[in-house]
Curated annotation (Swiss-Prot):
Pathway: Cell wall biogenesis; peptidoglycan biosynthesis. Pfam families: Dala_Dala_lig_C, Dala_Dala_lig_N. Binds 2 magnesium or manganese ions per subunit. PROSITE patterns: ATP_GRASP (PS50975), DALA_DALA_LIGASE_1 (PS00843). This is D-alanine--D-alanine ligase. Mg(2+) 1 binds at D279, E293. One of its GO terms (cellular component) is cytoplasm.
Amino acid sequence: MYVVIINIVLLKVLMVLTITILSGGFSRERKISLMSGKAVKKALDSLSYNAIEIDVNSNTAEKLKKINPDLAFIALHGPYGEDGCIQGLLEILGIKYTHSGVMASAIAMNKAMSKHIFRSLGIDTPKGYIISRGDILKNNIKIDYPYVLKPINEGSSIGVHITFSHEDYLKLKNMFSVIPVHDAGIEEEEPVWITRDLMIIEEYIPGIELHTAVLLDEAAGTMEIRPKNKFYDYKAKYTNGFAEHIFPAEIPDNIYEMTLEHALKVHRFLGCKTISRSDFRYNPKDNTLKMLEINTHPGFTELSLVPEIAKLTKGIDFNELVKIIIEDSLQHKKILEIK
């Protein structure tokens, strides 16, 4: 009898999956990534997985080879984490991972490329184009006020500037005239030029901020965000009390359905996996909906939008959502396995 009990215990030990949590990294969203990583670690511990945290750096490949995990949970945000880089490394190492693959991650992270995809699918998106730092300094801008200037491949509203007037432009020009010695701190509300010579400039869409979650190839729901300030910026996204979350979004039914359809259409077209979040602006004055971007690695703490929508629509708590992501990700084939 004791032998049977011991064998059962050993079997359970052997069946425990080792999951590495990749967080931190090099991007300006490092702080948020570490928060996501800690939340995932807490959930994995409560779910009795063998969870190992890795703060991603140049030695990450060696650490992963040594650990040889059953799965890597990607809790990274921004460049190198959600742009296909870490996904490519994991493919080479033969390690399964969560969220979307190399191609979907790379395309979704590139705002200019994403806008072309949206238009090709018949989805309206703000008018805009790629602009150089030099053209900004010379005021060689082909879009009328107000307009939005943002990095091609950043998240969390980092480096986003809304310009309503010539006075705003002069402030922007002064800011961009300074060439930083290094990247500005992630917590700065008005970061200086982001060590890139190209950005996206697009028309400003007044109205309502909307976020749609896709979970397991199903559009789960759309949330409305009402920031306390004019703009849903870094502080509003990650500071309690700086934005009000309204669910379901208080918009016309046909517009609500349109957000679900657009989010799912882009998710499927790019080949996104497990979860994604699409962002929209709705202008009630002219009844237009514009898709801004799709996020393959949305923020992932218990207070983040996708977990909140999953809880409100499906009754799925954070721990259960983590388990769903893991189980779904383990079923995905690695690129090298696809024939």
